[in-house]
Structure formats: structure tokens, C-alpha cells
């Protein structure tokens, strides 16, 4: 079976974005926003050539090829994050007990969920903002992973254990992920 001697992926850098690469740490800046991430892999090299980021690996194995594509996707998400940002939308649903959802500090507090006396709490990751308007919860930020984790924390805080989710549909559910409707 022939073996590829070289695999390379290129990421185009937009005009209004600055990228710095030091020892496989990629720093992406634009308009006062900055994302920093370190990619540790022994065979993969990341460098900047003109207005492109080049990710390459010599004599790659299957996992090395996959990792090159993964790093490319992470860098694309970093560039999209500092230029556009990411937004997740969640909906508050209840049948009988009206929930009261509020933001205090770095937590989302869910009161009166299924008539419970003690509030449920969901952690907000650093660098993420949560806004509540009516039955909509909007989670925004520049780091896709932190925005997604915050939305998942909110959704998991209202999970009902031991009951059929087809019948008991109360909770807060993700309805749109980074521009894609679910």
C-alpha cells in the first residue's frame, strides 16, 4: 500500500485578522478580541506563510492525518470566533410550574423548576455572556467550545431523572447551535 510522504492543510487568514504562531501556540486577534490555543502533537508543524496558516506532517499515519484536519478546523473556528462570534439559542419550556430563569455572576439560576423549592444552577464559562428575554436564552462568545459548554450546562441543569422525557417536556432546550437550527 502506498504511503503518503506529506500531508498539508492551509487556512486563509482574512485581512482584518492577525495571527501569531510560537512553538505550536496559535494566537488569533481581531478588533480587540483574542483567542489563544496550544496544539501539542509531536509530528505536526504549524507555521505562517504570507496570508495563510500551513499545518503539515511528514509521513503521516491515519491518526496524524485526522489530527491535521482537526487542527485546521480548530483554527477556522478561532478565526470565525474573533470575527463573527458564536451564538447558541435555547428555549424555556414548561407545562404547569412557570420557571424563573436569571443570571447572577457566573451562574444561571433556574427557580421553580417542576415546583422545586431549591433553585438549580448552571455554570457560565469564562468569556461567555448569557441574556434572557422572555422564553429565549441567548448564549454568545468568541470561543466555540466555551459557548457550547455553557449551553450544555444550562440544558443539563434542567434534565429530569427517572421520568419519560417524551411526557415530561419541561426544561430549557438548545434550539439553534452556532447558526444551525436543530
From Swiss-Prot:
<keyword id="KW-0694">RNA-binding</keyword>
<dbReference type="GO" id="GO:0003735">
    <property type="term" value="F:structural constituent of ribosome"/>
</dbReference>
<comment type="similarity">
    <text>Belongs to the universal ribosomal protein uL6 family.</text>
</comment>
<dbReference type="InterPro" id="IPR036789">
    <property type="entry name" value="Ribosomal_uL6-like_a/b-dom_sf"/>
</dbReference>
<dbReference type="Pfam" id="PF00347">
    <property type="entry name" value="Ribosomal_L6"/>
</dbReference>
<keyword id="KW-0699">rRNA-binding</keyword>
<dbReference type="InterPro" id="IPR020040">
    <property type="entry name" value="Ribosomal_uL6_a/b-dom"/>
</dbReference>
<comment type="function">
    <text>This protein binds to the 23S rRNA, and is important in its secondary structure. It is located near the subunit interface in the base of the L7/L12 stalk, and near the tRNA binding site of the peptidyltransferase center.</text>
</comment>
<dbReference type="GO" id="GO:0022625">
    <property type="term" value="C:cytosolic large ribosomal subunit"/>
</dbReference>
<comment type="subunit">
    <text>Part of the 50S ribosomal subunit.</text>
</comment>
<dbReference type="InterPro" id="IPR002359">
    <property type="entry name" value="Ribosomal_uL6_CS2"/>
</dbReference>
<keyword id="KW-0687">Ribonucleoprotein</keyword>
<dbReference type="GO" id="GO:0002181">
    <property type="term" value="P:cytoplasmic translation"/>
</dbReference>
<dbReference type="InterPro" id="IPR000702">
    <property type="entry name" value="Ribosomal_uL6-like"/>
</dbReference>
<protein>
    <recommendedName>
        <fullName>Large ribosomal subunit protein uL6</fullName>
    </recommendedName>
</protein>
<keyword id="KW-0689">Ribosomal protein</keyword>
<dbReference type="InterPro" id="IPR019907">
    <property type="entry name" value="Ribosomal_uL6_arc"/>
</dbReference>
<dbReference type="GO" id="GO:0019843">
    <property type="term" value="F:rRNA binding"/>
</dbReference>
Amino acid at each position: 500500500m502506498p504511503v503518503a510522504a506529506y500531508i498539508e492543510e492551509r487556512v486563509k487568514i482574512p485581512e482584518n485578522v492577525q495571527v501569531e504562531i510560537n512553538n505550536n501556540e496559535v494566537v488569533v486577534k481581531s478588533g480587540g478580541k483574542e483567542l489563544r490555543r496550544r496544539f501539542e502533537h509531536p509530528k505536526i508543524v504549524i507555521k505562517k506563510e504570507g496570508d495563510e496558516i500551513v499545518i503539515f506532517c511528514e509521513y503521516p499515519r491515519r491518526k496524524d492525518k485526522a489530527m491535521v484536519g482537526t487542527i485546521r478546523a480548530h483554527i477556522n473556528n478561532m478565526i470565525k470566533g474573533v470575527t463573527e462570534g458564536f451564538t447558541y439559542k435555547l428555549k424555556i419550556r414548561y407545562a404547569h410550574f412557570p420557571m424563573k430563569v436569571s443570571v447572577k455572576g457566573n451562574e444561571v439560576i433556574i427557580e421553580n423548576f417542576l415546583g422545586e423549592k431549591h433553585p438549580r444552577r448552571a455554570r457560565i464559562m469564562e468569556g461567555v455572556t448569557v441574556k434572557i428575554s422572555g422564553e429565549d436564552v441567548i448564549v454568545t462568545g468568541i470561543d466555540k467550545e466555551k459557548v457550547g459548554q455553557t449551553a450544555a450546562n444550562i440544558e443539563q441543569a434542567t434534565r429530569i431523572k427517572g421520568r419519560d422525557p417524551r411526557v415530561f417536556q419541561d426544561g430549557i432546550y438548545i434550539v439553534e447551535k452556532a447558526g444551525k437550527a436543530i
